[in-house]
Amino acid sequence: MNCLSRRLSHTLSAKSAIAAALALLFSTAAGGAAAATPGNDPVALGQIRNAALQSNWAYERLEDLTDLIGPRLAGSPGAAAAVTQVADAMRKLGAKVTLQPVKVPHWVRGVETASLVDYAGRPAGLSQKVVLSALGGSGATPAAGLRAQVIVLHDLDELKARAAEVKGRIVLFDVPFDQTMADHGLAGQAYGQGVLYRGLGTRLAAQAGAAAVLVRSVGGADFRLPHTGSSGLQDGARIPAAAVAAEDAMLMSRLAKRGPLTMQLTLTPQILPDTDSFNVIADLPGTDKADEIVIVSGHLDSWDLATGANDDGTGVTSAMAVIETLKKLDFQPRRTIRVVAWMNEEIGTRGAQAYVDANKALAEKHVAAIENDEGSGRVFGMRTSVPAESMKLFAPLRAALLPMGAAGFQRTDVLGTGDLSGLERAGVPSFSPLIDDSTYFNYHHTAADTFDKVKPEDLRRHVAVMATTAWFLANMNEPIGRTPAPPAGERGR
């Protein structure tokens, strides 16, 4: 049994799950009309699961989003087109659609080139190109670029110890992504270790007087792909910052061991005035508890290097498909199921904050929130921040997901996933699909995050887990409690 299997198996209540699963297996084969609000009986849960597993609606919407629009960085024409496309698709389903205004940052990538122009042993007249990509929020070099010596660092302690050497130089944080952790079901933790340098590391380098800062790309595969992402730079100290392909970071480390290493770097991004955008909100109204809300969500924006199929096209289209699945079955939930396509997750989560600000008085009416933002790998169940004493209430849901091998439920005190962090701080229990993300960071934030990387059968499984979970939450009789507020600043990826 591998680590992921052990992690999932200990969460299952075998006796209750198997008993309920047997009921499902004998009852869900029959089709036919269903009551408008059938509740959480095994037949209804099985019908939702099976309907989702047989539909390619989300996959078709993903193709529309990625192939017809392309990149969707907040503030860009692509992001605006995506808002219109998603809103239109949800209106066609009969959902009640609202566009919630959000002021978003408008960062534009410019020229990005780099070469190693001087190093020990360099043949006269030669230089070596470095593959890199500017980080979100990066400052710019002069138009003609800057030339400076590179100092290679391997952790923040080394930055502190060598602070006197940093001023006026180009800092490179050469910290490899731990693919072994990713292969053993800990890709998120591996990413967290690396992203520390893209965030805090860039800010500390700027404070130390660096002329520019580079980070080794936070991701696996190492196919000379730079992985972009948000920097930790702040106004008043926005030095040029970029992610370097892993192979180039290793090359620079080797050359720096031979002697002084000089780079010619040109980055010309711009930070334009904030612009208007929107969260897309689509409601499937409830019945007797219509004033209570269950959110199902993904983020609509993407980075500008690719079409954001995995990050987060699959998340937003699987959320949209929850309403499509229930509409197809003519099921109406007791509580309102609200699909939210968040805007601006990648550079600041302003869409999520706008939603929290607008709904402070209604926080208690938000029963639960689901976000799918960890790629399109095979899903095995759910992670959740519900109180420990509420976990037993989910045995019927786990039983419904057991036939498709997605009954694993993993509880954590703080889920803190991106767009849901503000709701979680308000006490709203959060859920996120438990996904095999061992290869997710091969493509994450790169030019290779494209539609062809998504398997339709895996996306169908995402929809099945999300739709069944959303329905279950929307029809529960028992309260599931509130989540204790996480520490300030706690958030996911």
Where are these regions (language model features)?
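Metal-dependent peptidase/peptidase-like ectodomains
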Residues: 53, 91, 121, 143, ...
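Bacterial N-terminal signal peptides
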Residues: 15-29
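Active-site-adjacent substrate-binding region
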Residues: 206, 212, 216-217, 234, ...
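Soluble metallo-hydrolase cores and metallopeptidase-like ectodomains found primarily
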Residues: 43-44, 119, 129-164, 231-309, ...
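Noncatalytic luminal/extracellular "stalk/propeptide" segments of secretory-pathway proteins
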Residues: 37-44, 63, 67-183
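N-terminal capping segment at the start of a domain
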Residues: 39-76, 102, 225-233, 301, ...
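Second-shell loop/turn segments in exported
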Residues: 45-53, 67-77, 148-156, 161, ...
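Alpha-helical metal-binding/catalytic segments enriched in His/Glu/Asp
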Residues: 90, 197-198, 205, 280, ...
